[in-house]
Amino acid sequence: MSNKFVITWDNMQTYCRQLAEKQMPAEQWKGIWAVSRGGLVPGAILARELGIRHVDTICISSYDHDHQRDMTVVKAPEGDGEGFLIVEDLVDSGDTARKLREMYPKAKLIAVCAKPSGADLLDEYIVDIAQDTWIEQPWDTSLSYVEPVNRKSK
């Protein structure tokens, strides 16, 4: 992907607050299920903004930084998702979103960003991103990309 879209911490906070506004009234939600790992930070921000204390994770592995690979469900809450917000940072190809819809047909699926291939699978999102654009999330960057600690000195 030749194009890059960098999201700062300030941008992420703003986008998540906008997404939270669309989820009001907060009392309608039993909790938030954040999709690990990209949905963890947005999920935490939404939990704060909505005053939700019940936060859990859905652990689906399909990326290794910038390489998509086979999808593996590592951890999944039980139930059909009724009353829960499922939070992602980004819906790209839509593969993960399709899997989430299959697993939790009654949940509300939301994301901060969406690319055209997956946008229709979401109930709501904030930022449109071109399909050929790579997103650098604030937790992946400083002034430039920083390798995670566990990848140094290997």
Curated annotation (Swiss-Prot):
Pfam families: Pribosyltran (PF00156). Transmembrane segments: none annotated. Xanthine binds at D92, I135. It is found in: Cell inner membrane. 5-phospho-alpha-D-ribose 1-diphosphate binds at R37, G38, R69, E88, D89, L90, V91, D92, S93, G94, D95, T96. Guanine binds at D92, I135. Its EC number is 2.4.2.-, 2.4.2.22. Pathway: Purine metabolism; GMP biosynthesis via salvage pathway; GMP from guanine: step 1/1; Purine metabolism; XMP biosynthesis via salvage pathway; XMP from xanthine: step 1/1. PROSITE patterns: PUR_PYR_PR_TRANSFER (PS00103). It is a peripheral membrane protein. One of its GO terms (biological process) is IMP salvage. Mg(2+) binds at D89. GO terms for molecular function: guanine phosphoribosyltransferase activity; hypoxanthine phosphoribosyltransferase activity; magnesium ion binding; xanthine phosphoribosyltransferase activity. GO terms for cellular component: cytosol; plasma membrane. It catalyses: GMP + diphosphate = guanine + 5-phospho-alpha-D-ribose 1-diphosphate; XMP + diphosphate = xanthine + 5-phospho-alpha-D-ribose 1-diphosphate; IMP + diphosphate = hypoxanthine + 5-phospho-alpha-D-ribose 1-diphosphate. GMP binds at R69, D92, S93, G94, D95, T96, W134, I135. Its cofactor is Mg(2+). Keywords: Cell inner membrane, Cell membrane, Glycosyltransferase, Magnesium, Membrane, Metal-binding, Purine salvage, Transferase. InterPro entries: PRibTrfase_dom (IPR000836), PRTase-like (IPR029057), Xanthine_Guanine_PRibTrfase (IPR023747). It is an enzyme of class 2 (transferase). SUPFAM superfamilies: PRTase-like. Homotetramer. HAMAP family: XGPRT. Purine salvage pathway enzyme that catalyzes the transfer of the ribosyl-5-phosphate group from 5-phospho-alpha-D-ribose 1-diphosphate (PRPP) to the N9 position of the 6-oxopurines guanine and xanthine to form the corresponding ribonucleotides GMP (guanosine 5'-monophosphate) and XMP (xanthosine 5'-monophosphate), with the release of PPi. To a lesser extent, also acts on hypoxanthine. Belongs to the purine/pyrimidine phosphoribosyltransferase family. XGPT subfamily. This is Xanthine-guanine phosphoribosyltransferase.
